[in-house]
Amino acid sequence: MQIYPLRLLPNKIDFDFMNFKAVSYSFSIILSLISFIWIGIYKFNFGIDFAGGIVIEVRLDQAPDLPKMRGVLGELGIGEVVLQNFGSERDLSIRFGISSEENLMKNIELIKASLQSSFPYKFEYRKVDFVGPQVGRQLIEAGAMAMLSSFLAIMVYIWVRFEWYFGLGILIALVHDVILALGFMSITKLDFNLSTIAAVLTIIGYSVNDSVVIYDRIRENLRKYHKKNITEIINLSINETLSRTILTVITTLLANLALMLFGGEAIRSFSVLVFFGIIAGTYSSIFISAPILTMFANRKFNNKVIER
């Protein structure tokens, strides 16, 4: 039995993506500048992981209903409250930020009273600690190093698999995606915490995967069509992979939509940022990383890529 691939678009689609190269570059530059300016003026809404706060360690007599507990504490109006199990499922860590020193003890007592009145558990409060912003700075540095390391590893991988020009194209696209993601996070006031660092790394991985698929087709078409110029080759390659690109982005967005709707407040920043990043990564793989290869369009470049 012959298996036919699922296609959303006709086989012979011929949309001239390269004709919009100048428009897409201008659009991306404008969005990047807006992101830079907004971040410079309004900064980020740093979560407890980076801004510091209070940590309450408590042991319960049974496993708690964490989603319900998050909902109850989230309605107290004291800002972000993070609940996590540690050790056993009966051990709970409650973290929240410090709005002011005057409200510190009041908020601690408010949390205790709310838990006691809303749940039938027995609570044994074991420790109350202050986590300073110094720890937050260390986490920011670690997150920045993680992103930088991923950039370098991706550059080396693309250089080995294709050619350094391709690595430069992907690097520009990734910087574009990260800037837009950070700008989106600042504009929407999403909590900047460890989960958003994971979201940015997820966006980087998705964007690279999309670009590599198009790059593979460009290399294949360079071998097949010796008389076509690089602009025609890139345009043909984007069109040939367009059905796959659309199917991938739809299925990924649907999976992420489930996280946004049912994942709860604990992963809200992660799921919303990844949703935006998937769209940005798809856009950059088509309109940034592929068209930018025309800057290196010469015969020597073509021969090097074909040999790989």
Swiss-Prot record:
One of its GO terms (cellular component) is plasma membrane. Keywords: Cell inner membrane, Cell membrane, Membrane, Protein transport, Translocation, Transmembrane, Transmembrane helix, Transport. InterPro entries: SecD/SecF_arch_bac, SecD/SecF_bac, SecD/SecF_CS, SecD_SecF_C, SecD_SecF_C_bact, SecF_bac, SSD. One of its GO terms (biological process) is protein transport by the Sec complex. GO terms for molecular function: protein-transporting ATPase activity. PANTHER family: PROTEIN TRANSLOCASE SUBUNIT SECF, PROTEIN-EXPORT MEMBRANE PROTEIN SEC. Forms a complex with SecD. Part of the essential Sec protein translocation apparatus which comprises SecA, SecYEG and auxiliary proteins SecDF-YajC and YidC. This is Protein translocase subunit SecF.
